[in-house]
Every structure is written in C-alpha cells, then in structure tokens.
Amino acid sequence: MKKIILSLAALSMLAACHESLEDRCAREVKEYTEKKCPAMIAETVRIDSLGFDKDTHTVHYYYTLLGKADNAQVVAKSNPRKALIQEVKNATSMETFKEAGYNFSYTYWSESHKGLKLFETTINKKDYAK
C-alpha cells in the first residue's frame, strides 16, 4: 500500500510539472512584467509591460518613447517594423515560441502625449521565417 501511495504521489508530481507552452508563456510574461517593468532599455525607450493572448498566441510588448524618439515623424522614418522583424529572427530567447508559430506584437506610446500611439505592428511566422 505504501508503494502505491508513493507511486501515485510521484505521478501526480510529474503531471503537475508538465506545463503547456501557452501556460508557460503566460507565466513568463507575467513574471517578467512583475519583476522588471517598467524599465529603461535605452535612453529614449522604456518597456512598460508584456501581455499574452492565448487565443491568438500573441506576445504583446508595450513601450513608451521619450525625448527625441517621442515623435511620430521620427518613428515613421525609422522603419521600426523592419528592425523588429530582424530582432525577432535573431532572438534565441524566443526560439521555442517561434517554433510554435507564435506572434509578437509591439506597441509604442508617447510619453509627452498620453494616449497617443506612435507605432504598432505584429510580427508573425510569415515575417520571421523568411
């Protein structure tokens, strides 16, 4: 009887350790946001939070632009989508999620004009698998 109980306990612990990719992503996004956001990642860029939409398998990155970067014309001229696609292609930390075909969405807000969205794009498998 003792062996059966120990075996059942071991099996339940193994089952509890198995986490779906969606649950893992949701957990990691939440932990990152709670531990590291907001944070300056460059002189003119602050990461505010991350989010995850399980239905669309989309990881959302929310940023605020400050100073000289806080300008819609500057953002438009810099072609951020192209740079973000390259960043996703090169990001080894995203490999598991890229292999599963996840999407990566980026939203940049203005610091000086609250509520003004300066740029938004979603990078999907068609973009980063090229």
Give names to the regions the model predicted.
Residues H18-S20:
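Bacterial signal peptide processing site
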